[in-house]
Amino acid sequence: MNTSLFVRPEQRQAWQQLQTLAQAPAVHLRDLLPQPGRSHGLQYQAAGLSLDASHQRVNANILSALHALAEESQVLDKAQAMFRGEHINRTEDRAVLHVALRGRAQSTPPWGAEISQAVSAELTRYTAFAQALRHRQITGHTGEPITDVVNLGIGGSDLGPRMATEALWPSDDGFHPPPVQVHYVSNVDIWQLAKTLSALHPARTLFVVQSKTFTTQETLTLFASAKRWLVDGGCPADQCHQHLVAVTAKPALAQSLGFHAERCFHLWDWVGGRYSLWSAI
């Protein structure tokens, strides 16, 4: 697939056709809905989802132009290139394989068995850790179980997991809090971290430091402040690792900063921040 040339969508012939169709007099839905076969012809199913477009003001000409635009833009070819692991991220010269994180088990995945096996192994690791955390089996330096998790990260390392936590927070009956409280800090200004930690106890707090490269200055600053809080709260410096988890593409660098190997979960460099929710993030 040749990706060296980029043609803007509005420069394509199908786009011009769509613009012409958009300028046509609007047709009311009451005139479209009675058309024979409309409901069946505009219903689609894929990946467990059902889509009914029959109540949109589209017709055969519009659909044909949309399909033509997709073909002219080589959407399918580019999607297949992504699945094969080609470096379609031209800015960073990387693959874009977040789909491997959420792909179902396949005998011959387009991204290769090696990647699937690595993803499966990492999923098993961090799922087991999360389950142990929920069952109060993860302890701090005093032997007390961890009751609070503080997520340190910015961008996709904050927004995705924060959304999931808020969406899935209620227990089965909707009243009882989860066994472990999760807090998020993304502002390098010390006030947000200080406010969060003011209600927590160092012996029962675990920090999850999310950084693909461990070079993000904001995250490193928050991490340094968190370690200082642990030590000031009575945790021996050589025991801080019991209160630290790293999610990163650079586990060796994380370990050089004090994280233990078993508490480093892998985030591949082919996972973009906005898609990292499907990883250990």
Which ranges hold each PLM region?
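Extended, charge-enriched "interface" segments that sit outside catalytic cores
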Residues: 6-34, 38-142, 147
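Glycine-rich phosphate-binding loops that contact phosphosugars or nucleotide phosphates
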Residues: 128-136, 142-281
